Amino acid sequence: MRFCRGTVLGRSAAGMAVLLALGACYEEDDQTLPSAAPGESVAAESTHWLEIDDSRSPETFLSAESGLPAQTLAPLLGALSAHYRESPRMIANRVLQLWQEYPDTPLERIMADLVPARDAPEESLGPVAQQYRVLRAGGAGHADAVAAAMGQRE
């Protein structure tokens, strides 16, 4: 069969090619952090996520993944949840991912240090976590990365 430019069949084939190309570019907004640059290790690939249909509480999930007592994690998660827009489930996923990528910093310290000042406006943890990741990947230590990511530059 011959496809001619300008015919209905030719336009349909061109339209289908455009749709397929656009479909390949589509990424679902799943609230995950972007992947690492080529050559960088991607801990997120091995991260266990607390799925939306998981019956465990975020504290229980973090406890199972980190080995820390849920009673230690609950107040930290509560403080983070009081400030950030994400659900406790998503906050648990984000802090676990940061800890798995940078295990040199204890999970409870990451969580405690990400709790903003009481008078800070509510915001999203996603951009804060992403800036922290970028800074740590660039060689910054935990304290400097947290301070910069949370806008506490001096």
UniProtKB/Swiss-Prot annotation:
Protein's GO biological process: methanol metabolic process
Q: Which UniProt keywords apply?
A: Methanol utilization
Protein name, per record? Protein MoxZ
- Source organism per entry reads Paracoccus denitrificans
